[in-house]
């Protein structure tokens, strides 16, 4: 027999329900009939006493009234998983929002589950080849790791995310799940259209909880996407890419309902269980013995304050950071990754090997020296530099340009064929530049090419054109 209750109080997205017979468990999904054939789903958060539970609605509470009937569905929110969700846009409840018919899934899974047990986790640190030179050389990603993508508006976060999705699909045959948490609806639509055009949509599942949706949806949509990714990892044995844009909104949503749930606010008005919420999501993103989930998370930094509790809590979980810089974007170098600001825990000789490590460190030293010399160059010009510094500056400028790379997903905008560069080729190219083997080549030859051989071929063409 169904366990039924009655709404006794509604405050914004928070609904109190009285159950006379049996109280639903914490995180159970409650169904409320709006009376027009539509149902509202709410998730139990607290037991208040006197047979009352407090729940957070996953959709707008407009039109609800006290006295309306509520049904305890039994389990937590369950969403479709498996191959059926590929190529689809779903909402927090796993319902399709792309007008392409119902999702014919053979399996459903609850969005709340424990992180993999300690003995099930993979312990080897394995580098994840992205095919993007600047990332693979200086801030390599770890399989089953978490990567923070920091960048302002218009510096290329979305294009970088799309290229990663493309390279995983083409290069590794892997699957991706994209969770748009508190996304602009327009950006979500753009991403869908671009994926459709570039042909990576059938290897991707999109889960959106947009900015205009109530906090309940933004609070749980990350877990919905993660549940789908976990299924690909555990049942299909896949190496999955899990994108979250934006992880900050995942911490912002509970802070909106925290006071309504009767919790005392903590620092800067955030919810007191901020670290617990974040840990529950992040600890599920890991490698197991069957497969891995590698997560790329766009991080919005409120007022550029990295000590704000939301980004600070995110930092503790990250294995690598990829920082996009407006200065580099303004030079026309894309991807606009800042080579000196981006970091990775995998940049260790015992993980990536001595050749890769030494090349990366030398590249950073040259770029750091170039940065120090820029004031002198701006005031006095190149002629005032020592011969040694002139060589360093020339090599640094070539390295900067060699970091640029044509992307597959931007082919229709740039007119250039996208390039996937293996780690081996990347190391060889930068090593040759550092060793001075290409000091005679013009800077332009290094702009928007793949391997060093392409740069040499481009230099020959430039020289022919000059003649």
Curated annotation (Swiss-Prot):
GO terms for molecular function: ATP binding; ATP hydrolysis activity; proton-transporting ATP synthase activity, rotational mechanism; sodium-transporting ATPase activity, rotational mechanism. Keywords: ATP synthesis, ATP-binding, Cell membrane, CF(1), Ion transport, Membrane, Nucleotide-binding, Sodium, Sodium transport, Translocase, Transport. It is a peripheral membrane protein. It is found in: Cell membrane. One of its GO terms (cellular component) is proton-transporting ATP synthase complex. Its EC number is 7.2.2.1. ATP binds at residues 151-158. It catalyses: 4 Na(+)(in) + ATP + H2O = 4 Na(+)(out) + ADP + phosphate + H(+). Belongs to the ATPase alpha/beta chains family. The ATPase of P.modestum is of special interest because it uses sodium ions instead of protons as the physiological coupling ion. F-type ATPases have 2 components, CF(1) - the catalytic core - and CF(0) - the membrane proton channel. CF(1) has five subunits: alpha(3), beta(3), gamma(1), delta(1), epsilon(1). CF(0) has three main subunits: a, b and c. Produces ATP from ADP in the presence of a sodium ion gradient across the membrane. The beta chain is the catalytic subunit. This is ATP synthase subunit beta, sodium ion specific.
């Amino acid at each position: 027999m169904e366990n039924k209750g009655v709404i006794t109080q509604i405050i914004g997205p928070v609904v109190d329900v009285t159950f006379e017979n049996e109280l639903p468990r914490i995180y159970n999904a409650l169904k409320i009939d709006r009376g027009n054939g539509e149902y509202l789903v709410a998730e139990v958060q607290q037991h208040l006493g006197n047979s009352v539970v407090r729940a957070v609605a996953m959709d707008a509470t407009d039109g609800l009234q006290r006295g309306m009937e509520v049904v305890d569905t039994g389990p937590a929110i369950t969403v479709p998983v498996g191959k059926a969700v590929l190529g689809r846009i779903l909402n927090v409840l796993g319902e399709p929002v792309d007008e392409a018919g119902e999702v014919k899934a053979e399996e459903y899974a609850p969005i709340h589950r424990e992180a993999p047990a300690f003995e099930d986790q993979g312990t080897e640190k394995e580098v994840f080849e992205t095919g993007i030179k600047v990332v693979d050389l200086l801030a390599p990603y770890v399989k089953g790791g978490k990567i923070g993508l920091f960048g302002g508006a218009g510096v290329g976060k979305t294009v970088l995310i799309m290229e990663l999705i493309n390279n995983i699909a083409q290069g590794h045959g892997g699957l991706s799940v994209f969770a748009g948490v508190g996304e602009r609806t327009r950006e979500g639509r753009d991403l869908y259209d671009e994926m459709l055009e570039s042909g990576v949509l059938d290897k991707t599942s999109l889960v959106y909880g947009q900015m205009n949706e109530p906090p309940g949806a933004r609070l749980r949509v990350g877990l919905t996407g993660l549940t789908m990714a976990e299924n690909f990892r555990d049942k299909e044995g896949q190496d999955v890419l899990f994108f979250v844009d934006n992880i900050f909104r995942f911490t912002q949503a509970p802070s909106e309902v925290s006071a309504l749930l009767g919790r005392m606010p903590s620092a800067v008005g955030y919810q007191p269980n901020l670290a617990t919420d974040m840990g529950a999501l992040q600890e599920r993103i890991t490698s197991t013995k069957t497969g891995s989930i590698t997560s790329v998370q766009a991080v919005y930094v409120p007022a550029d304050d990295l000590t704000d509790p939301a980004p600070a809590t995110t930092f503790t979980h990250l294995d690598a950071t990829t920082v996009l810089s407006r200065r580099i974007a303004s030079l026309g170098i894309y991807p606009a990754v800042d080579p000196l600001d981006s970091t990775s825990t995998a940049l260790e000789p015992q993980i990536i090997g001595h050749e890769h490590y030494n090349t990366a460190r030398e590249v950073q030293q040259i770029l750091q020296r170039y940065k120090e010399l820029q004031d002198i160059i701006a005031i006095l010009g190149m002629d005032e530099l020592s011969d040694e510094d002139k060589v360093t500056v020339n090599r640094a400028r070539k390295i900067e340009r060699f970091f640029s790379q044509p992307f597959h997903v931007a082919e229709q905008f740039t007119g250039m064929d996208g390039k996937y560069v293996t780690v081996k080729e990347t190391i060889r190219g930068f090593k040759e530049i550092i060793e001075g083997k290409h000091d005679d080549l013009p800077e332009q030859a290094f702009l928007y090419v793949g391997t060093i051989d392409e740069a040499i071929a481009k230099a020959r063409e430039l020289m022919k054109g000059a003649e």
